[in-house]
Amino acid sequence: MTTTAVTHIASLVTNDPSLGNGTPLGLIQDAAVVIDGDRIVWTGESSKAPATDNVLDAAGRAVVPGFVDSHSHLVFAGDRTQEFNARMSGQPYRAGGIRTTVAATRAASDEELSANVARYLAEALRQGTTTFETKSGYGLTVEDEARALRIAGRHTDEVTYLGAHIVSPDYADDPAGYVDLVTGPMLEACAPHARWIDVFCEQGAFDGDQARAILTAGRAKGLHPRIHANQLTYGPGVQLAVELDAASADHCTHLTDADVDALGQGDTVATLLPGAEFSTRATWPDARRLLDAGATVALSTDCNPGSSFTSSVPFCIALAVRDMGMTPDEAIWSATAGGAAALRRTDIGRITPGARADLVLLDAPSHVHLAYRPGVPLVSAVWRSGQRVV
């Protein structure tokens, strides 16, 4: 295989505390990275880099791991601009919310949906995202949910079955019947196309008992749990996530002390989604409280047409630092290694020998600029699995 060295990196974020300055980011100054095929095979000081077939001079710019976006909803059609405009104008809007997207998604062709996913993922890639999870949840029939997962699987191997996004409009008068569908025929059709199962555990969606039944059924089919938890109100979602060893509890906006302690002591990652609070003018999650309790925190976009229509992880990093109590170091770790932890992956989110060669070259000397210069397109080059893709 051809080897490539990226040299003269001003600041390299490895996410290996044993390297560099000994912090969680494992920062190495004046660094180099060697790529062989799809893997990283060497990191260290630029002056000590081994000979390679190709050399790229970073010219004093920073390199960070590819961003890991562990929560998105990309298989959809249409948009919800009217809803957003009404919300930002302080006007009531009752035209359907998620149901609006469900109707548009059901009406779209496979080709239209796949093209939409490809477009949003290309948009994210240009901003440094090299790993992305995405969900179903805008079909809410057996056929449409399975179709969404098949389409998602063309673009990523981190696919989540979210038949339990809301109760389908077709079952508005029979929510128990819809839970039976989600845990029965829909699960049978969807399980072969997904790695994960998710549920929106919230007032107006699924209560704790329903969420438990859905996640337990999915686990019996080999799908690992994730959960939308405690976004709009206090509720049982976080405690259920920890109890069921869910990989991630997502949103985590309204937390009791017991919720925070459970996340601090368990293996479930608290995935924070600042784009949702930004887009809805809602209360910000308290990242500082979680971090101080010892919780593992991930940052993700929650890219979706209703409450967080952004594919930009750098934007979410800036929000987390400005409004959620995170330091720049904590935010970059959460958007890379934290996202990897939320997907229970050890091959991504870091720049160390053996990891997948996912790198982002910034047009800046330090990762801090991602928060320091919000809205500025700082991504200069992106490698995914050893291939330069931007």
From Swiss-Prot:
Fe(3+) binds at H71, H73, H228, D302. GO terms for biological process: L-histidine catabolic process to glutamate and formamide; L-histidine catabolic process to glutamate and formate. Its cofactor is Zn(2+); Fe(3+). N-formimidoyl-L-glutamate binds at Y138, N304, G306. It catalyses: 4-imidazolone-5-propanoate + H2O = N-formimidoyl-L-glutamate. The keyword Transcription does not apply. Its main location: cytoplasm. Binds 1 zinc or iron ion per subunit. Belongs to the metallo-dependent hydrolases superfamily. HutI family. Catalyzes the hydrolytic cleavage of the carbon-nitrogen bond in imidazolone-5-propanoate to yield N-formimidoyl-L-glutamate. It is the third step in the universal histidine degradation pathway. HAMAP family: HutI. This is Imidazolonepropionase.
